[in-house]
């Protein structure tokens, strides 16, 4: 009898899964495939070819893939390699609490190039969740603040985190729900193209983000000693601004961001910091039928751009830059090094740069599929994010752990709650 063993069959997306095939002839080429449908019905799929051992088994923790979407020993490769059938789609979970992704794992007892066209010898359907049992989601419409607050089970107080994404707009909750599953009170913060917020981001109104940080500090289940900020891309730029100007922010994680105000000017009361304009004429076509925006952002070292550099030396707490050195959207390693250099110049010693070789722009939570290119709602062409498959996915595993460890070390959390 041919079979598949998968453990665990119900898990969070950032948890590893063990996959074994058994009951096959020895030294036989087989095909393992995975697929799922997202909430809009789009299919994402992956496959790899293996050769069974002398006992007719394949163990993804030991057996190397001979080909397919990846090669070598890669226990999570079928999850990491999930790619869209419709070009330029990105796998994003929106209903993070109510339902999991159902991942269909299929075993074919021979080489199958188009595995879904034939009946598999064995199948398993597993659940991949974005929120642990007991995590609570609260939709936030408090003053001007719009978002979703995720609370771990228990009384707290919990370390608070403001969580933001980039220029995709809307409200993305999947990182916050996972952070809450790991013990953080995380506010997934929208800042444009959501609810009654502006459709387009015309300027960065720091008062809005200050209100969000204070809301989180004031929540009875969140420590009032300060909050962390986690953000990527344009959101990371805003996170660095928040760290530099807002006393509520005590720890900041910038994922592939910049070190200056770009495209949209910063407004904070009477303070106005003009942005460095994007150089749209520098968009570069790539082999992926998409465009690289690496050179869109002008050099902040130019004399005319000096006033736009973010004064991170004023930040109350430590700052961690997580960067992929194959980022094809931002020159993020350069920006991180410039930020660290400025901090050291002014005597701030708690700015850290963690660079991941061969990783691209979209450093997502562990277990997320590799997304080298996608099309967003606010850019007219598909964009290349960069990175190499295996190093990028391994970097996601590492940086997801480092991000949490950094936040736990640096967000002070009182022992008694405020209820």
Predicted regions: what they are:
Residues 2-12, 17-28, 36, 40-54, ...:
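N-terminal cap/lid segment of alpha/beta-hydrolase-fold proteins
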Residues 141, 353-359, 384-387:
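Short glycine-rich catalytic loops that host catalytic nucleophiles or stabilize transition states
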Residues 144-145, 155-218, 265-267, 371-386:
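Cap/lid segment of the alpha/beta-hydrolase catalytic domain
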Residues 170-174, 182, 210-282, 291-308, ...:
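Primarily recognizes the serine-hydrolase "nucleophile elbow" in alpha/beta-hydrolase
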Residues 289-362, 395-402, 407-419:
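Serine-hydrolase catalytic core
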Residues 364-382, 392-399:
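Post-His helix in hydrolase/transferase enzymes
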